[in-house]
């Protein structure tokens, strides 16, 4: 055998060099590196070691020997089957057997001596079967006979090794016999150890009995002695525990008193869960789930139930119920007793309404003698302003509403919180869409109208036209026998403004407006916003009571303490009476415009009620989303394609503007493109808005607000673009364009040419060839065609050939003759028309 290096051997055996070196070292072959060579002798030694390891199979068999009672002894038999010479096996067997027998005899004699040295204890031991071997091994250990000489075991059974018989699985008698002898020795030693263990337990019980009885056995309790004797009798001569002899049970004739089921009164609130209902009825949730299943409702323990379903479950399970009044706290807190207060006359609350750019703010500006219009972008009022004006005949509170169509909800709120509506109509424009809408809101709120025909100073002004148009909409002037006062005014020159104020005060006298000037204040939120350094700021119109600085107030889902109050001129005030607009600071958040404002004496109750309202809003929103998902699922069934979503983050200067823009943008949604406003708020654009825009791939829109420096830096890093607007028209138009870009283009067919068949020829190569005259447009070889007969489409396909005389042509223009071969169609007749068209993509528009 040729010499080989360690590295070559490792490569041939697919082993690592280090692992091979360790294996060689374990076989007694010392090598240090992969370059060392292996001699033929070393290779032979290595092969013998490997073969001897492979030819040895260790087998382990575990059986259990039962002692009397509940105890078992596990017998583990290990044997090795080795393929070797017979002589070696016989010699090893001959040498090992005498030594093993002598060792076993010595160990057995030692164990017997240990047992003989134990203390003599009186015990009556019955002769029982000592050891039972498993039935499959078919061997037994003979029963020993021990003399009754107290508790001391005077003789041990002689265990003969020849009596242990085992099955020979592999036919190797010598190795099996050797393993069986070892197993018998182990069984015997374990039996002796067990006996010794129980002797120790007996001594411990004896000592415990002595302690219980005092100094000696004589003073022991007889009951304890009998119990100890019973314990000692439970062991046999091998120390194995006997089976317990149970005394026969004496049957007693007893009468079980019937227990009446507890009937509970369960308080049920809307949206109660299965687990809550189960807890109130003191039953498991699974039982209620079973009842629901029998009713045909699949539910889990966390499922919310409506009150009707919960009532059925409670009655089904035999309990009583009471319905929880969720408005109990709100009624207790918000209802104010004013029976002890007197009413006084108050100033009228007047809302100026009308179409865009008809001069509402200019008219109010003239009345207030200030210049507010210059601050509004494009001369359009972006949010509601509340102002108090004092005249010679009394005070008037004005609410200015935007005229744009997006601010419908604002006008609706303005109509609800007002006493008189001044409808401004431009004399040169007449009645416009928002004018009609203002009339509808005023009539719905049952508020009297005073019409101000504005811009009367213009040459093209026509007040009679305005009167006739309004009369068609049931706004009848007093001169025509109606109840509506018409006043011609000019916000530019001030003409007729005094007459308008006099008409308003006259109307208020007719209405006999009164309010409580004392007690806890009530009002309505006209506008709200978030100002840097001041926090949430709300413009509130007080309707009843006296609002004072330091009062605990509740506005919708927000609460707080009035830290400061300012009037419409920006001056700090300590108190505000009915029909007074004020700005208040100190709320926990920005309330929604139109929320009711109430003063609550207990701040804790205000906080609790605000949390309850917030929870109701969340539950209503979740329920609405679930119903929308369900309806959308049915509506979208059968529709192909996926709906595109334009995600928007909207930030504005005031709550009313944000709400109005939100409603306008949501109305733009179609079946193909949906507007999803994932976040909206008041104040500057912050870095959190940018992070949200990056995570959700949304567009950030700011209305009359800008991004702070941190947001700008983050936007430059993440590539987020801000869109700033100060006029609502531009914002809505840009969003429409963005939505149009998300629309999938529409495929449209356009006819580019028509050829009339004049004669038909037969060709062996192409079949029927139509001799045609192009009567319209151009016929192109590559475009699809239709064959028309009597203006009815009879075939649609493509051209196989287009020839001008004998030459192939790519296209033939109007007025020229050509030969046309239609692919896979031979039924061309004279008088047919071949229509050539093309498919083009057309961008969709909203």
From Swiss-Prot:
Stretches the record annotates as Disordered: 198-219
Protein's UniProt name: Translation initiation factor IF-2
Renumbered residue ranges of the record's region G5: 490-492
PANTHER family reported for this sequence: TR-TYPE G DOMAIN-CONTAINING PROTEIN (PTHR43381:SF5), TRANSLATION INITIATION FACTOR IF-2-RELATED (PTHR43381)
Compositionally biased residues, Basic residues: 207-219
Region (G3) residue spans: 400-403
Region (G4), start-end ranges: 454-457
SUPFAM superfamilies named in the record: Initiation factor IF2/eIF5b, domain 3, P-loop containing nucleoside triphosphate hydrolases, Putative DNA-binding domain, Translation proteins
Organism per entry: Francisella tularensis subsp. holarctica (strain OSU18)
Localization, UniProt: Cytoplasm
């Amino acid at each position: 055998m040729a010499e080989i290096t360690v590295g070559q051997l490792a490569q041939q055996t697919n082993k690592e060099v280090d692992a091979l070196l360790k294996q060689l070292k374990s076989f007694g072959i010392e090598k240090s590196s992969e370059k060392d060579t292996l001699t033929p002798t070393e290779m032979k030694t290595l092969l013998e070691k490997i073969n001897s390891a492979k030819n040895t199979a260790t087998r382990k068999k575990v059986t259990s020997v039962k002692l009397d009672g509940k105890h078992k002894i596990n017998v583990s038999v290990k044997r090795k089957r080795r393929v070797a010479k017979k002589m070696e096996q016989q010699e090893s067997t001959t040498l090992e057997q005498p030594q093993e027998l002598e060792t076993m005899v010595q160990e057995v004699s030692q164990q017997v001596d240990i047992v003989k040295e134990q203390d003599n204890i009186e015990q009556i031991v019955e002769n029982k079967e000592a050891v039972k071997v498993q039935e499959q091994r078919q061997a037994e250990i003979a029963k020993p006979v021990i003399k009754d000489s107290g508790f001391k075991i005077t003789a041990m059974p002689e265990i003969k090794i020849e009596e242990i018989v085992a099955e020979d699985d592999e036919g190797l008698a010598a190795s099996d016999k050797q393993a069986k002898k070892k197993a018998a020795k182990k069984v015997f030693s374990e039996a002796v150890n067990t006996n010794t263990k129980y002797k120790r337990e007996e001594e411990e019980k004896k000592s415990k009995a002595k302690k219980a009885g005092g100094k000696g056995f004589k003073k022991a309790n007889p009951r304890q002695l009998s119990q100890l004797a019973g314990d000692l009798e439970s062991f046999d001569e091998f120390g194995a525990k006997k089976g317990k002899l149970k005394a026969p049970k004496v049957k007693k004739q007893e009468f079980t008193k019937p227990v009446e089921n507890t009937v509970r009164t369960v308080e049920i609130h809307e949206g109660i869960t299965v687990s809550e209902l189960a807890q109130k009825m003191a039953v498991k949730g699974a039982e209620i789930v079973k009842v629901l299943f029998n009713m045909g409702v699949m539910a889990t323990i966390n499922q919310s139930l409506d009150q009707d379903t919960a009532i059925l479950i409670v009655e089904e399970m035999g309990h009583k119920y009471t319905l929880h009044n969720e408005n109990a706290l709100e009624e207790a807190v918000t209802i104010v007793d004013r029976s002890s207060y007197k009413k006084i006359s108050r100033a009228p609350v007047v809302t100026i309404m009308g179409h865009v750019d008809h001069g509402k703010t200019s008219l109010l500006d003239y009345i207030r003698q200030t210049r507010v219009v210059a601050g509004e972008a494009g001369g359009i009022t972006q949010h509601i302003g509340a102002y108090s004006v004092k005249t010679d005949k009394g005070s008037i509170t004005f609410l200015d509403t935007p005229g744009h169509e997006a601010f419908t909800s604002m006008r609706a709120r303005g109509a609800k919180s007002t006493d008189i509506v001044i409808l401004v109509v431009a004399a040169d424009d007449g009645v416009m869409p928002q004018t009609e809408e203002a009339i509808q809101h005023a009539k719905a709120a049952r508020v009297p109208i005073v019409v101000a025909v504005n811009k009367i100073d213009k040459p093209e002004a026509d007040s009679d036209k305005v009167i006739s148009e309004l009369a068609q909409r049931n706004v009848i002037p007093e001169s025509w026998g109606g109840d509506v006062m018409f006043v011609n005014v000019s916000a530019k020159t001030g003409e007729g403004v005094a007459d308008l104020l006099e008409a308003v005060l006259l109307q208020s006298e007719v209405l006999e407006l009164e309010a409580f000037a004392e007690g806890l204040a009530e009002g309505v939120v006209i506008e709200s916003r978030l100002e840097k350094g001041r926090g949430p700021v709300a413009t509130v119109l007080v309707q009843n009571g006296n609002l004072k600085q330091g009062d605990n107030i509740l506005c919708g889902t927000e609460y707080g303490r009035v830290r400061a109050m300012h009037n419409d001129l920006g001056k700090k005030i300590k108190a505000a009476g009915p029909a007074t607009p004020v700005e208040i600071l100190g709320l926990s958040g920005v309330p929604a415009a139109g929320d009711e404002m109430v003063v609550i004496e207990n701040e804790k109750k205000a906080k609790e009620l605000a949390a309850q309202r917030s929870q109701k809003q969340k539950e209503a929103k979740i329920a609405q989303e679930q119903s929308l998902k369900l309806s959308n699922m049915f509506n979208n069934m059968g529709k192909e394609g996926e709906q595109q979503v334009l995600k928007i983050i909207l930030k504005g200067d005031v709550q009313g503007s944000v709400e109005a823009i939100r409603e306008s943008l949501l109305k733009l949604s179609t079946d193909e493109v949906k507007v999803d406003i994932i976040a909206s708020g008041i104040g500057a654009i912050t870095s959190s808005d940018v992070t949200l825009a990056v995570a959700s791939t949304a567009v950030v829109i700011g209305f009359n607000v800008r991004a702070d420096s941190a947001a700008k830096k983050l936007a430059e890093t993440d590539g987020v673009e801000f869109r700033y607007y100060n006029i609502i028209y531009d914002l809505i138009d840009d969003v429409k364009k963005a939505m149009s870009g998300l629309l999938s283009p529409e495929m449209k067919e356009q006819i580019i040419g028509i050829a009339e068949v004049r004669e038909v020829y037969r060709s062996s190569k192409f079949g029927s060839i139509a001799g045609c005259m192009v009567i319209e447009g151009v016929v192109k070889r590559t475009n699809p065609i239709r064959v028309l007969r009597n203006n009815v489409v009879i075939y649609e396909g493509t051209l196989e050939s287009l020839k001008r005389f004998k030459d192939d042509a790519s296209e033939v223009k109007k007025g020229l003759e050509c030969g046309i071969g239609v692919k896979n169609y031979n039924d061309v007749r004279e008088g047919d028309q071949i229509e050539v068209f093309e498919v083009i993509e057309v961008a969709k528009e909203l």
